[in-house]
Regions:
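C-terminal catalytic histidine-bearing segment of alpha/beta-hydrolase fold enzymes
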Residues: 1-46
Length: 137
């Protein structure tokens, strides 16, 4: 048996630790259900990582399915309320919808939770400036 065959067998046997868009039913409960199955399979408690939830939101923004995207971003914030990236995700979703005031409120929260050393800090600053400019027009 080749190493590639063994890898393929294990790859398909175990659930990925990272939920993909095609595995998301559109219901937030499906995220919890998926990670309950992963946890059971691996014998340890695993929760959806913050970035996985946020990436699902970005995916649905890209498909212009804003209702799903906003629901995911809000769920991300509920699960990770101290994570600035979660608020920036929501800000991005609202910005893409043209909801600039809501986007600004969310990015302001991201900035309140981050420091200048945070990887996304400059992204938040740039988004805040852009939104403030859009709201002046």
């Amino acid at each position: 048996v080749s190493a590639a065959s063994t890898f393929s067998a294990y790859h398909h046997l175990f659930l990925s630790a990272y939920l993909r868009p095609q595995q998301f039913s559109g219901d937030i409960k499906s995220i919890k259900d998926y990670y309950a199955r992963v946890s059971k399979q691996r014998g340890e408690k695993l929760d959806a990582p913050e970035w996985v939830i946020r990436e699902l939101g970005y995916h649905y923004v890209g498909e212009q399915n804003y209702d799903k995207a906003i629901a995911l971003f809000k769920y991300d914030i509920a699960e990770y309320p101290q994570t600035p990236d979660a608020y920036n995700g929501l800000a991005y979703g609202y910005e893409q919808m043209g909801e600039y005031k809501k986007a600004l409120e969310s990015v302001n929260q991201a900035l309140a939770l981050s420091t200048s050393e945070h990887d996304g800090h400059q992204v938040y600053v740039n988004r805040q400036k852009r939104l403030q400019s859009l709201l002046k027009d």
